[in-house]
Amino acid sequence: MKRMIRILMIAICCMLTCNMAANAGNDKPIAVNALPIKAQTLLSNHFNNQKVILATIETGVINKSYDVVLQNGTKLEFDKKGNLTEIDCKQGKVPVKLIPQAIRNYLKENYPAQAVKKIEMNKNEYEVELANGLDLTFNKH
């Protein structure tokens, strides 16, 4: 009986693993108006002069995210609620209003001549990449 339960558990684990692998990386193109309202608002407020080249939805086993590529090469990533989680500006810089005030103050004092090229917002921290290639990590609180 124990052997049968063990075999059943292994089979279930294998099926779940295969299902997760099959669902990973499911990027599907979507229309801009299919993005969450919060994401649409951010795009119109901060990137109104840039055309959206590609918007995709990525559905995973547990979560869902949206990726947007703009005409100038800027890439944005949003979570399922439309909160910005990453912005990567290939040309130009991250709009100042998208950088938290405390980080802006620190950068102005310590790196006044450097533009922010990329910022990632994780659960507990911000990861910022400057134009000179320097990566900085800040706590959210």
Question: Each PLM stretch: what is its role?
Answer:
Residues 1-27:
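Bacterial Sec-dependent N-terminal signal peptides
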Residues 25-141:
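Interaction-mediating elements
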